Amino acid sequence: MKNEKRKTGIEPKVFFPPLIIVGILCWLTVRDLDAANVVINAVFSYVTNVWGWAFEWYMVVMLFGWFWLVFGPYAKKRLGNEPPEFSTASWIFMMFASCTSAAVLFWGSIEIYYYISTPPFGLEPNSTGAKELGLAYSLFHWGPLPWATYSFLSVAFAYFFFVRKMEVIRPSSTLVPLVGEKHAKGLFGTIVDNFYLVALIFAMGTSLGLATPLVTECMQWLFGIPHTLQLDAIIITCWIILNAICVACGLQKGVRIASDVRSYLSFLMLGWVFIVSGASFIMNYFTDSVGMLLMYLPRMLFYTDPIAKGGFPQGWTVFYWAWWVIYAIQMSIFLARISRGRTVRELCFGMVLGLTASTWILWTVLGSNTLLLIDKNIINIPNLIEQYGVARAIIETWAALPLSTATIWGFFILCFIATVTLVNACSYTLAMSTCREVRDGEEPPLLVRIGWSILVGIIGIVLLALGGLKPIQTAIIAGGCPLFFVNIMVTLSFIKDAKQNWKD
């Protein structure tokens, strides 16, 4: 029994360092919020202005890697000897489900406002040119390019899972071909895993920080309960308790059902917005935006704005590339696990086509609706943000639709379910990554899962206390820096091992 407890207990070298680091950072932040905001602005400015180019080149190089996989020597290689575990339709639906988080609903509803009010390329704010480019930039940030980078890493993890039969719960496990078993299991591997975990904790905390205000603003709109930081903290606490109950009572099946409900409700809500907002305009705007994307793509790929220094690529493109980098390993592991039995080419094409369609539908429908409301002067987003915050502005874009009460109820349920599944996924991923020899299909210890969900909740509350989007953007960018190198090492390790062991 003692040996069994040791096996399923925490792994101290990857459990305590992230816990201590994140705990200290949260404590320092809460001690002096004003000083923390000064540091946040300095970190954001340094990383985006000094190293933003590196994130842009990373995405471009990974795009070339995608073409190499699709048309290169491994294109027809199968990821495992078994037939595909899921039908193509189910596989693509699962991909779509992974895109419908509350954070995605947050950005999809408000992102276009920022693009047209502070546009790139020296365009006049709120001008025709800015509006023509607004959705095109969303399609760029959430389109084929980032999904192509995920394709490469998904192939890498699927190769390690199903071809090499490796148990991978932390990125260091994949680095044996690159640095050797001694270093991968030694200090170097421990450092890599700690970088990954700290970054992942902050990423999940930021997602919670984006999702929670949407739920509390819905509560204010529906029930008249004032939106305060205390209410945010209460809601986050309720999610943590609900997650603990689900785990303790073996209700994981219920969580999976909730995830399916979230996906179907997402389709329903998007369909509703598409129909009542203006289907003809949405399709015309999308078509025009694809053309604008193709026209400006080379400039977008390499846009750093070093002369005019308007800040658009730093505030948005670099931020989003860091967002994609920081979630790459977690997301790619999930996508790899549902892709057993598929060929490399099939996985690459399926991800780029299926996931791009998912994100493009979300951003096109929600962004077009927001633009229509702005153009018709139905809502005043700048005033809403200044007086009440970004979350209220997002809620008003939904409340402006017909049958507003029913619409807000649907949005409220969607955000609530999305965040419940987010907290559950957060606690599971972090617990799996910080426990000793918990294999796929087994459950990590209950207290470890609850502990991590509490810490992620604390980070969400701290980011909300700081106020505004800049702390959230900075947390993502700071976390993305170390994972930038981790992702590259995983990629190189796959290439090296495949060259030696994946021959005809």
UniProtKB/Swiss-Prot annotation:
Keywords of the record: Antiport, Cell inner membrane, Cell membrane, Membrane, Transmembrane, Transmembrane helix, Transport
Major subcellular site: membrane
Protein function: Catalyzes the exchange of L-carnitine for gamma-butyrobetaine.
Coiled-coil positions: none
InterPro entries: BCCT_CS, BCCT_transptr, BCCT_transptr_CaiT
Lipid biosynthesis is among the record's keywords: no
Entry's family note: Belongs to the BCCT transporter (TC 2.A.15) family. CaiT subfamily.
Assembly mode: Homotrimer.
UniProt xrefs under PROSITE patterns: BCCT (PS01303)
Official protein name in the record: L-carnitine/gamma-butyrobetaine antiporter
GO molecular function, one term: (R)-carnitine:4-(trimethylammonio)butanoate antiporter activity
Catalyzed reaction equations: 4-(trimethylamino)butanoate(in) + (R)-carnitine(out) = 4-(trimethylamino)butanoate(out) + (R)-carnitine(in)
GO BP annotations, alphabetical order: 4-(trimethylammonio)butanoate transport; carnitine metabolic process
Pathway per the UniProt entry: Amine and polyamine metabolism; carnitine metabolism
Membrane-spanning intervals of the chain: 10-30, 51-71, 92-112, 143-163, 195-215, 231-251, 263-283, 316-336, 347-367, 398-418, 446-466, 475-495
Stored NCBIfam families: bcct, PRK03356.1
Subcellular location: Cell inner membrane
